């Protein structure tokens, strides 16, 4: 759904499943890799020419999972529509990647419909992972991911028009690789 004022994508559909407590409570920092993970969904627009030669707008959705220890994007899904499969595939990959954590993990999100799904919360329970959710309508509760989205869109999206799904998808994937390989390394070196 969309809010009239900003037209920003909102995955909130009301209470459609499990709403978990906010376990993170803006305590984003951890020195333990793979202990605190955050996720969210963001939307991008691109254009294609239809069979009648008209320019039509389409959307692409990105579902990344980020390690709060170092900001690394551990896994992500990209699709033409918001989909449970996209979120679950990225979730399962992240669960596998973070299985080496010696402490109980916490996966944080907003209250979007995908994170309220029974299959999502059941998968976390299966792995003894705490589920945490931001308070309704409070983007500051997931500011780590919101900051990443802001950086991503500033670097590759604002002021640029994409003319195909593949072009936009490829640019997002290139940026995530660059972000993980170069930007995080640079920021880690600055902290030393």
PLM segments and residue spans:
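Conserved small/polar residues in nucleotide/adenosyl-binding loops
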Residues: 185-192
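RNase H-like two-metal-ion nuclease catalytic core shared by retroviral integrases
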Residues: 10-15, 109-111, 117-118, 133-153, ...
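Short, surface-exposed connector motifs at secondary-structure boundaries
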Residues: 72, 100-105
């Amino acid at each position: 759904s969309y809010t009239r004022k900003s037209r920003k994508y909102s995955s909130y559909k009301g209470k459609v499943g499990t709403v978990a407590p906010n376990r993170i409570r803006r305590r984003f920092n951890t020195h333990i890799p793979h202990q605190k993970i955050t996720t969210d969904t963001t939307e991008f627009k691109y254009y294609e020419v239809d069979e009648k030669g008209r320019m039509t707008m389409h959307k692409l959705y990105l579902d990344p999972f980020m390690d709060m220890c170092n900001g690394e994007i551990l896994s992500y899904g990209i699709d033409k529509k918001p989909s449970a499969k996209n979120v679950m595939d990225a979730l399962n990959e992240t669960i596998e990647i973070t299985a080496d954590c010696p402490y109980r993990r916490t996966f944080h999100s907003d209250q979007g419909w995908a994170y309220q799904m029974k299959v999502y919360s059941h998968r976390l329970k299966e792995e003894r992972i705490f589920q945490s959710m931001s308070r309704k309508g409070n983007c500051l509760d997931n500011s780590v991911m919101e900051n990443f989205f802001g950086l991503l869109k500033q670097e590759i999206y604002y002021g640029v028009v994409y003319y195909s799904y593949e072009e936009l998808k490829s640019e997002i994937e290139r940026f995530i690789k660059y972000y993980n390989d170069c930007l995080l390394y640079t920021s880690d070196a600055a902290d030393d």
